[in-house]
């Protein structure tokens, strides 16, 4: 996956949040 998504996930955000943030 992309770094943005990995970083988002490590921050404790859920999948949908990371898709919106990084998509």
Swiss-Prot record:
The keyword Cell inner membrane does not apply. Signal peptide: none annotated. The two disulfide isomers globular (C1-C3, C2-C4) and beads (C1-C2, C3-C4) do not show activity on Kv10.1/KCNH1/EAG1. Expressed by the venom gland. It is found in: Secreted. GO terms for cellular component: extracellular region. InterPro entries: Toxin_25 (IPR012630). One of its GO terms (molecular function) is toxin activity. Changing residue 5 to A: Loss of ability to block Kv1.2/KCNA2, Kv1.3/KCNA3, and Kv10.1/KCNH1/EAG1 potassium channels (kappa-Ktx1.1 mutated). Same effect observed.1 mutated). One of its GO terms (biological process) is defense response to fungus. Disulfide bonds join 4-22, 8-18. The record marks 5 as: Aromatic residue of the functional dyad. The record marks 19 as: Basic residue of the functional dyad. Keywords: Amidation, Antimicrobial, Disulfide bond, Fungicide, Ion channel impairing toxin, Neurotoxin, Potassium channel impairing toxin, Secreted, Toxin, Voltage-gated potassium channel impairing toxin. Its main location: secreted. The modification Cysteine amide is found at residue 22. Has the structural arrangement of two alpha-helices stabilized by disulfide bonds (CSalpha/alpha 2(S-S)). Belongs to the short scorpion toxin superfamily. Potassium channel inhibitor kappa-KTx family. Kappa-KTx 1 subfamily. This is Potassium channel toxin kappa-KTx 1.2. The lineage of its organism: Eukaryota, Metazoa, Ecdysozoa, Arthropoda, Chelicerata.
């Amino acid at each position: 996956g992309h770094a943005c998504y990995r970083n988002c996930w490590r921050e404790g955000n859920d999948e949908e949040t990371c898709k919106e943030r990084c998509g």
